[in-house]
Amino acid sequence: MSNITKLFVKSTKNFSRSFSRKTVDPSYLKISPETKITTLSNGIRVATEQTYGEVASVGVWVDSGSVYETDKNNGVAHFLEHMIFKGTAKRPTPQSIETEIENMGGSLNAFTSREHSAYYMKVLKDNVPNAVDILSDILQNSKFETSLIEQERDTILSENDYIQSKEDEVVFDQLHAAAFQGSALGRTILGPVENIKSITREQIQEFINENYTGDRLVISAAGAVNHEQLVEQVKEKFANVKMSQVSKDVKRAAITNDFIGSELRVRDDEQPLIHFAVAVRALPWTDPDYFVLELIQTMIGNWNRGIAAGKNIASNLGEIVATEDLAESYSTFFTCYQDTGLFGNYGVCQPERVDDLVAEMLKEWQRIATSCNKNEVERNKQKLLATTLMQYDGTSKVCEGIGRQILTLGRRLSPFEVYTRINEITVADVQRVASTLLRDVSPAVTAIGPIANYPDYNFVKGWTYWNRL
């Protein structure tokens, strides 16, 4: 063996050892803020993590989104989000709500997803009671005036036009429509245009009555907040919220979301680039291998021409895409739901490169399932740990994390548990999960743009179990 070879082998061994050590001492994570949870008599769960400071975030997280709609009222959850800020008897106009929040230096935000809705505020600690009062008022006493509903239609229609102009939004909506055909997850969050134009006050109120029940509400807070005081405030302000007569589990059991391998393409030769996604059925929130698939997502990575690293990036697929000039960008996504999920790649490329790009993506899936190594697994575990543990920093992120995890898992994951579960992932775990989910499967495929060169579906499916030469 030459001296150069000996030096290379020695360097490789040192490199391997550097990743085999624990680079983070997790003991400090055991002293993270305690999550206190109290369940009220009407089913509302109040959860807090108290830290020192002057600021607190408090929010209401609702186990209700577009998945609980029908074809007839699809879009009502999102419409409700818009209307919730339009006035109550106590705060009769949108301006009165905004002024009150601004006068106490706070902020109010909301979102609607396929499974959840959320309304949350960030305020100084002395204003937490005011925040609870505002949230309880808008969620229970909104007037939903017909004139304001008519005005808001135009706003939502404009929002829909904007979304339809964003290729990534269109691709992911089409991906859901293809993967979950004829099911609740296949619908869009905004709903079809005809529904936006026709949703009524009665439909909005009915949706609240059916879905905004105590057993489906989590009120979470983080930062400078006292748990016992918040519990008393919620007891008072949300006393009129009732338990559901039909449990959420019974309602959800009636909703089927079977994954269907399929394709949905929209050809538009006037567009300069192809936007596409290829995805497989993934894991739900509660699956024990959740963090393994998160790690696989990290390993496959993301890339775009604007990143500073250029071609010098850690991701194997990213290096190939950059070196061979295959794409303008690509990303890896893992979207979780209660009983299923989507995992895959989204890509943007020139029409003549799409065949090679799709092939390399699926080749990378197979490589991870069969021959990924310890060094890349350990390196990406550190990256995943960093991005995941950052979600435990900052009152807004912590408040959101508490609400989401209690809705999806029924409990709060501590930073120490997250660290332990990620740190214990092995190469064998990665290969096992990748082999199960990413090999020899029928994917869902969507593409828009000049797609004449997009590979035939049978080729895409075939590339999940054999490599193109």
Curated annotation (Swiss-Prot):
Subunit structure: Heterodimer of alpha and beta subunits, forming the mitochondrial processing protease (MPP) in which subunit alpha is involved in substrate recognition and binding and subunit beta is the catalytic subunit. mppB is probably also part of the cytochrome bc1 complex as a core I protein in the mitochondrial inner membrane.
GO molecular function: metal ion binding; metalloendopeptidase activity; oxidoreductase activity
Keywords in alphabetical order: Hydrolase, Membrane, Metal-binding, Metalloprotease, Mitochondrion, Mitochondrion inner membrane, Oxidoreductase, Protease, Zinc
SUPFAM superfamilies in alphabetical order: LuxS/MPP-like metallohydrolase
Positions annotated as active site in the UniProt record: 81
Task of the protein: Catalytic subunit of the essential mitochondrial processing protease (MPP), which cleaves the mitochondrial sequence off newly imported precursors proteins. Preferentially, cleaves after an arginine at position P2. Plays an essential role in mitochondrial biogenesis.
Annotated control of activity: Binding to alpha subunit is required for catalytic activity.
Binding annotation for Zn(2+): 78, 82, 159
Subcellular location: Mitochondrion inner membrane; Mitochondrion matrix
Signal peptide: none
Induction: Antisense RNA inhibition of the mppB gene induces gene expression of nuclear-encoded mitochondrial proteins (mppA and cxdA) and surprisingly also of the mppB gene itself. These results suggest that antisense RNA inhibition of mppB induces gene expression of mitochondrial proteins, presumably in a retrograde signaling manner. Up-regulated by Pseudomonas aeruginosa, PAO1 strain and PA14 strain infection.
Record organism: Dictyostelium discoideum
Lineage: Eukaryota, Amoebozoa, Evosea, Eumycetozoa, Dictyostelia
Catalytic activity: Release of N-terminal transit peptides from precursor proteins imported into the mitochondrion, typically with Arg in position P2
Cofactor: Zn(2+)
EC code(s) of this entry: 3.4.24.64
PANTHER family reported in the protein's UniProt record: GH01077P, METALLOPROTEASE
Disruption phenotype: Disruption of the mppB is lethal.
Name of the protein: Mitochondrial-processing peptidase subunit beta
Record text on cofactor binding: Binds 1 zinc ion per subunit.
GO cellular component: mitochondrial inner membrane; mitochondrial matrix; mitochondrial membrane; mitochondrial processing peptidase complex; mitochondrion; vesicle
GO biological process, one term: protein processing involved in protein targeting to mitochondrion
Assigned protein family: Belongs to the peptidase M16 family.
